[in-house]
Amino acid sequence: MALKYHQQIISDLLEDSNGGLLILSSGLSLAKLIASLLILHSPSQGTLLLLLSPAAQSLKSRIIHYISSLDSPTPTEITADLPANQRYSLYTSGSPFFITPRILIVDLLTQRIPVSSLAGIFILNAHSISETSTEAFIIRIVKSLNSSAYIRAFSDRPQAMVSGFAKTERTMRALFLRKIHLWPRFQLDVSQELEREPPEVVDIRVSMSNYMVGIQKAIIEVMDACLKEMKKTNKVDVDDLTVESGLFKSFDEIVRRQLDPIWHTLGKRTKQLVSDLKTLRKLLDYLVRYDAVSFLKFLDTLRVSESYRSVWLFAESSYKIFDFAKKRVYRLVKASDVKSKEHVKNKSGKKRNSKGETDSVEAVGGETATNVATGVVVEEVLEEAPKWKVLREILEETQEERLKQAFSEEDNSDNNGIVLVACKDERSCMQLEDCITNNPQKVMREEWEMYLLSKIELRSMQTPQKKKQKTPKGFGILDGVVPVTTIQNSEGSSVGRQEHEALMAAASSIRKLGKTTDMASGNNNPEPHVDKASCTKGKAKKDPTSLRRSLRSCNKKTTNSKPEILPGPENEEKANEASTSAPQEANAVRPSGAKKLPPVHFYALESDQPILDILKPSVIIVYHPDMGFVRELEVYKAENPLRKLKVYFIFYDESTEVQKFEASIRRENEAFESLIRQKSSMIIPVDQDGLCMGSNSSTEFPASSTQNSLTRKAGGRKELEKETQVIVDMREFMSSLPNVLHQKGMKIIPVTLEVGDYILSPSICVERKSIQDLFQSFTSGRLFHQVEMMSRYYRIPVLLIEFSQDKSFSFQSSSDISDDVTPYNIISKLSLLVLHFPRLRLLWSRSLHATAEIFTTLKSNQDEPDETRAIRVGVPSEEGIIENDIRAENYNTSAVEFLRRLPGVSDANYRSIMEKCKSLAELASLPVETLAELMGGHKVAKSLREFLDAKYPTLL
């Protein structure tokens, strides 16, 4: 059932024939709105194109799902695999299609699409549009050729529409739109409809453990200290530097947007603080999302990877983070105390000798005993997540209510559906499935044993320090506080060494025990019985090693495969499916005394699938609160007012989880309030709808050389300018430079080039490199080959190094530049490249617009490039002749190509061979010793010599 505010939005969009920009609150079914507009589209109006960016793939799947649920034909996607004639027929069919901006812009420039047959274009990611984006390039061309085509842009991220200066106004200008439609959650029509039949909501606040409270407090203290340090730089807007804003990913964007232009002037300490704030935000998130052992794994990974460079590791409160995280998992006790306690009663936790001397190990009921006389032992604590117990209680309560309704013979058809549990990510889904299928303590024990095994692997990877790293003065110290024992040297202290040895002993014992159990069990690994009538099963995530399968059967680990080394949650593999269902007949494997559970389906919020319309659950447990999903629940209940729906929200009381959820709602409301104010005062030009554009118009025109022409020359008349054109490689349309060149009035000719990225004239070829691509090309050696090909076929080969406009115009800060010439330094690599290719010219560009100005200057005294000739460059003809080969004037190119294909000859040594040998015949007469000197090794020289001396096979 379509909601009334949905119908109102659709009618508002259809009223304006030119289109408009729709900004909707997150979770208010943007996909359903777009699907409704596609269903209302008539083929007689013309073809409708939906620009599909990589970030809009989940939105595309939702649109297709909603259209197919109404038995309407779903739009197909136009891909590059389709031939040009087939794409042309699709463009003229009048149906809606998904298409990527790169394919569409190339077809527009090559005139493979009849623009007059287009009814309109949908922009699915309006919040990511800028003046230089490919989508803006497309709209400008379409509007110049077909001013009646409508443009409708959509976004459900209002926060992104207010980031930066006049973001909304610039977006509307780039899309040639004059009308904006704002539909926040607090809009009267929306709030009334969603609150008319609200679901039954149960808000459960779970108290965090004392250690979790201590860790959260310590992280916030460290984060606050880092923010205070950043404020001292006087280079960041202090209003944005708050702990609350630091809880969101957008905080990184805010800080980097301010610091990127001056990034090369910042010291190492400030740069590290930016990275540390991102790490601390992850710690706050992982604290409430994952179990105690996984959190400790991630901390250990940080301690190894970040080393002395991190400032936050040396803060006074950081010790509490590591200490409390350890106490949630294990504690160290004296071996003498363990021995005395074992005389009184058996301990359920495992004891391990710090020296690794285990007199007896018994594996009975999950218990082990270690007889030791000295040292310390590791005693398991394995604190369970407080939410786990609450989740199981809710499931048991739900099943009891359903049984009562069944006995009372009430109509409970709506209450027998699947219980949906919404989690943040796939890893949480898998772990919660294990918890309700098995004993939570068993799950924690599996994680604990994997953690111990990872300790062994981590120790084998560590290399001894050859030389102590010299730390810059004041670097790694926060607020002037230096810890008594640094984390890097913690293993060197007495207590730290004892703890490390105790963990190694425990890990070794588990490793030995796992091998013994694996040998005893052999191939007999029974799986628990699964009753598929009581649950549905999605595709589960792969286990990191085969150890988990062994643990499922005997609760012990094997060591046949490598244990997990990087235990951070972001390193977990994601499942291909959107969600995971459980339990696998929880009643068959549930612990004794546990109650029966209803069928449960775990849903990962990050998958962004229309799970509510597919499963139609009657009970939903929001394990990880998310604002967008809460709105989806409201819309789902409003669309199904007669269906009973009970929603449980599980929060950690007084945690950053609650603070982040409430702040996300507040930030969205503030964004809409800002948009409403902007809309009331927004000045929109009358011709912004594109109706006044000519066929050859563009937003900018290059300065004419005849602007200052003398009046005595032909009465002051300006000579007719010849249209400048640039040949652009197809792959370059992933960047924004072709768009900017088109804005400058240049004609863009997209072709597939074998040599170069941009052809400015018959003699000028340009290879464009962004900073990241430049480093990668040097590493792979691709740049050397590209420059070699340009030098071979063009008189003026040019390497364009293009910086981002909002970042620093520098490779590195002045303090990082050393006097030493090293082969790994980027400046050294560029110097060697220029020395090797003397005709190569380097261009340094500050931004896209600066590049366009440089191209205009370079083309001022040059002829226009020939498209046909540029396509043939580097491509051999049927006779094997390559046109415009400059190297052929001095070298026999056929002989050179033959030489490079000989065994042992590579790009690194064929030039030295050419300098020594004048012909292939002379090369064949050289002895192995001389070849070894030329080729840089005896092995490659021997392979070439054997090839040259090989006998020619004959049939006689």
UniProtKB/Swiss-Prot annotation:
Disulfide bonds: none annotated. One of its GO terms (biological process) is pyrimidine dimer repair by nucleotide-excision repair. Its main location: nucleus. It comes from the Eukaryota. Its EC number is 3.1.-.-. Residues 343-363, 516-593, 697-718 are annotated as: Disordered. Residues 725-805 form the ERCC4 domain. Residues 697-711 have a biased composition (Polar residues). Keywords: DNA damage, DNA excision, DNA recombination, DNA repair, DNA-binding, Endonuclease, Hydrolase, Nuclease, Nucleus. SMART domains: ERCC4. A motif (Nuclear localization signal) lies at residues 256-272. Seems to be involved in nucleotide excision repair (NER) of damaged DNA (dark repair mechanism). Involved in repair of UV light, and probably oxidative damage. The UVH1/RAD1-ERCC1/RAD10 complex may act as an endonuclease making DNA incision 5' to the lesion site. In vitro, is implicated in double strand breaks (DSBs) repair and is required for homologous recombination in the presence of non-homologous overhangs. May mediate the induction of a DNA-damage sensitive cell-cycle checkpoint during the G2 phase. Belongs to the XPF family. This is DNA repair endonuclease UVH1. It comes from Arabidopsis thaliana (Mouse-ear cress). The gene is UVH1.
